[in-house]
Amino acid sequence: MPKIFRSLYVQVLIAIALGILTGFLFPSLGESLKPLGDGFIKLIKMIIAPIIFATVVSGIAHMRDTKKVGRVGGKALLYFELVTTFALVIGLVIVNILGPGRGMNIDPASLDTSGISKYTDAAGEQTVADFILHIIPDTLISAFTQGDLLQVLLVAVLFGFALLRLGKVGDTILKGIDTVNQVIFVILGFVMRLAPIGAFGAMAFTIGKYGVGSLAQLGYLMITFYATCALFIFGVLGLIARMSGFSILKLIRYIKEELLLVLGTSSSESALPRLMVKLEHAGAEKSVVGLVVPSGYSFNLDGTSIYLTMAAMFIAQATNTELSLGQQLGLLGVLLLTSKGAAGVTGSGFITLAATLSAVGDVPVAGLALILGIDRFMSEARALTNFIGNAVAALVIAKSERAVDVDRLTRALNGEDLPTIEPDVHSEERGEGRELDSLRPA
């Protein structure tokens, strides 16, 4: 096999192209390939919880300083709040300027709401108090069996601080956790060999089921949303990256394989483990990456934030529901809270949108039926923006903590070959370190 075809980047790219072609030419066949994409996502989700647990525990325990843990966590949460708020505002401003829903003149009573009932029902079942209580698992084990990232994060943080209190006994347990983490990443290497198959099945299903022609009516909203995400990535995140001393374009090139995987599966979770490896490989300390990236998947969903404000205002415009400035600010205020739980709710952004519209009451919930058909096509932009946003966040926090090898980061982003990840200062005696090549298909 030619060397170029051994690259995961090329394999996934070819798989996406073949998936689009299959779904377009053979729609029925494309729909039937859905299990390929679902199976790959399930394999990834199978190992996400243990990876996050081991990485967060290791990150906290290796810091040794509880004040540093609190400082990094505080910086991350402040960054997440500021950037996601900016994303919400940008979405609100652009949808008001361009008005993709104006002129549709749709009567909410005429919409078929049968397809959105499962989302509105799920949204109605969860209050703010329920969401907070949901973070606490019924048992330590249930957090892992249910695969809830927020619950796993809570257990991991408590476990990490507990190890700090145990002293030498904690160090012994930590060595075992680090070993388990290495085993999990070997398993990840096996799973990633199936990435092209998963991307092929997911893309074939999407095109086969929904078709390209069915997007024409709501295409303006999609174009507006994709353009807004691009503006946010290259404008806002690009400026943040530049202020922190690195290029957003070089970062995107560096994580291009992971971005293609996200594009093919429409899931930013599918590349989460590889993102952490790549950031460590680029010189960011494992302890910071292990805290910032997993928490970012619950609290730093920039693409989802843009989607929520744009979708809500699109429904209002399409149904001729006039919202005053005060009502729009009220909507924004509710979204500041509900958007932070998007990854912790089954159904993600769409249920969060339903919950928000139900809570605000100014925008007809029935209008969700308008965007149900294209939500799947908008998920790619959401996932890509979320993914890039978390990559930027990790590097920004790491640089603010001086927890990154600047020279190594520069070389990595410039495309230089750095095959072996340097071990952090706390793990040199154990010979830790993962080889990036171990995650590439042979």
UniProtKB/Swiss-Prot annotation:
Main subcellular location: membrane
Sorted alphabetically, the keyword list is:
Cell membrane, Membrane, Symport, Transmembrane, Transmembrane helix, Transport
Protein location: Cell membrane
Quote the biased-composition stretches of kind Basic and acidic residues, using this chain's numbering: 423-442
Q: Which GO terms describe its molecular function?
A: fumarate transmembrane transporter activity; malate:proton symporter activity; succinate transmembrane transporter activity
Q: Which residues form a coiled coil?
A: none
From which domain of life does this come? Bacteria
What is its membrane topology?
A: Multi-pass membrane protein
What Pfam families does its record include?
Answer: SDF
The protein's matches in PROSITE patterns, at most eight in alphabetical order, are given as: NA_DICARBOXYL_SYMP_1, NA_DICARBOXYL_SYMP_2
From the UniProt record, give one GO term of the biological process aspect. L-aspartate transmembrane transport
Entry GO terms, CC: plasma membrane
Q: What stretches pass through the bilayer?
A: 10-30, 40-60, 77-97, 144-164, 183-203, 221-241, 331-351, 354-374
Task: Give the region (Disordered) as residue ranges.
Answer: 418-442
Record's NCBIfam families?
PRK01663.1, PRK13027.1
Its function, per the record, reads: Responsible for the transport of dicarboxylates such as succinate, fumarate, and malate across the membrane.
Q: Which family does it belong to?
A: Belongs to the dicarboxylate/amino acid:cation symporter (DAACS) (TC 2.A.23) family.
Question: Could you identify this protein by its name?
Answer: C4-dicarboxylate transport protein
Q: What is the lineage of its organism?
A: Bacteria, Thermotogati, Deinococcota, Deinococci, Deinococcales
GN (gene name) = dctA
